[in-house]
Amino acid sequence: MKTDIEIAQSIELKPIVDVVEKLGISYDDLELYGKYKAKLSFDKIRAVESNPVGKLILVTAINPTPAGEGKSTLTIGLADALNKIGKKTMIAIREPSLGPVMGIKGGAAGGGYAQVLPMEDINLHFTGDMHAITTANNALSALIDNHLHQGNELGIDQRRILWKRVVDLNDRALRHVTVGLGGPLNGIPREDGFDITVASEIMAILCLATDIEDLKRRLANIVIGYRYDRTPVSVGDLQVEGALALILKDAIKPNLVQTIYGTPAFVHGGPFANIAHGCNSVLATTTALHLADYTVTEAGFGADLGAEKFLDIKTPNLPTSPDAVVIVATLRALKMNGGVAKDALTEENVEAVRAGFANLKRHVENIRKFGIPAVVAINEFVSDTEAEIAVLKELCASIDVPVELASVWADGAEGGVALAETVVKTIAENPANYKRLYDNDLSVQEKIEKIVTEIYRGSKVNFEKKAQTQIAQIVQNGWDKLPICMAKTQYSFSDNPNALGAPENFEITIRELVPKLGAGFIVALTGDVMTMPGLPKRPAALNMDVESDGTVLGLF
């Protein structure tokens, strides 16, 4: 069987100009990056704003195994299948981060016959957006340190600087560093650290900004630290939002590529869902809604993380809310949530499927709390058995949720037709009545408790002393009406990655609260969530190479 990269390299790509012609996009509307990649101009984005708004389909998943459950693959395959049954459809997904590509994932542009192309470019440097975000972030760090060196007119307390440097790699050695060493000519010594680029607030801002002016406004609002008198210091105080926006002036424009089947796709922005809000850009999603009758998008990790943030943080910034949510489930993930060890997930175990169904059931219930109909997609694997599939279908019927098998990895668009038809039927017969989980006017504690008790089903929230102090500071500064972005393990409803399935009566501890005023939310950190990942014992990078003719090897 061919690998993902071999399948991708066997496809004859169409020029991107031809792919997007059916959407009413012309050559003059594009800023080309070679023949197969382009950015859409702001003139065209503004021109389509008066178009009708299409249907929005959000793809999410149950709590995943470390290998992931094929959510991006299902998103791409579903869009291809919708086009196959005659629905004018676009995709709006995130750009992969190079860190996980070189680490555990080895690629994140779909898989099999449900991929966005050119996958090598998308997984590596693409159109340079990640570089621009990294540069803007680190330019701000350099400007902060220069301000300290040049006399510190703003009275910034170097012990209370929140802003970190970033790099788009998994590099645990950079989590804690000291900068400014080497004497008076080299700056003011202070403790610093690096996050991965996709954890930068600038990434979140890029994904929520609606235009250049909104981008500048959000950049100006970033809190970079505190003065000696404990008052906040912003980018606006440094007067450098214009310079940062200049670095990002092209990165804010959505990127256009294609699937194996020629479906147009926006691939733009890529914040993680366990440490950020986990959704592609508002600009890309909104523009897709104005260009197509159906837009298929995704939110990172399980529905407890990505989907909750999509619905509570991103949706209020969109012209519409999701008309349906597709929850991707795999039998291997259900079995893992049912107590099966990782090395036994390919063995038939009907009882483990029954036990693990509690996890899927909770995600379905949670989506319904937002007033949106859910559809379950079983992402098929060769190890799945007829008995396991039959039990899962029976269990889905018991909670009255539509369920379809999807084999888009192996069969492409054809393998998603049944799912596409079910989603279209669900949207037609069950109109969504979207409502947010909480009102922003609730206190910080109440909003967190709402997420923990209603989505995670925990019994109590504990706030460490540091978090309590930060809440008081947030209230004092008038930031307490912002939504909450939970930073939590993706493997469990709880903050314990080993508590699989559908745990109950657990307590969640909030250890820190970080205001992200530019993004417009407050991050609540739980457990041991890292904003700079490390590499595994055997990184995917060990399998990667490039041949003398430029052929890429090892991206899978």
Swiss-Prot record:
- Asked whether the UniProt record includes ATP-binding among its keywords, one would answer yes
Q: Name one GO biological process term.
A: tetrahydrofolate interconversion
Q: In which pathway does it act?
A: One-carbon metabolism; tetrahydrofolate interconversion
Which chemical reaction does it catalyze?
(6S)-5,6,7,8-tetrahydrofolate + formate + ATP = (6R)-10-formyltetrahydrofolate + ADP + phosphate
List residues binding ATP.
65-72
Keyword Isomerase in record? no
Keywords attached to this entry? ATP-binding, Ligase, Nucleotide-binding, One-carbon metabolism
Q: Which SUPFAM superfamilies match?
A: P-loop containing nucleoside triphosphate hydrolases
Among the GO molecular function terms of this UniProt record, one is: formate-tetrahydrofolate ligase activity
The UniProt record lists the EC number as 6.3.4.3
Q: From which domain of life does this come? A: Bacteria
Enzyme class, top EC level, equals ligase
Family, similarity comment: Belongs to the formate--tetrahydrofolate ligase family.
| Protein name (Swiss-Prot/TrEMBL) | Formate--tetrahydrofolate ligase
Biological source species = Streptococcus pneumoniae (strain CGSP14)
Gene assigned in the entry: fhs
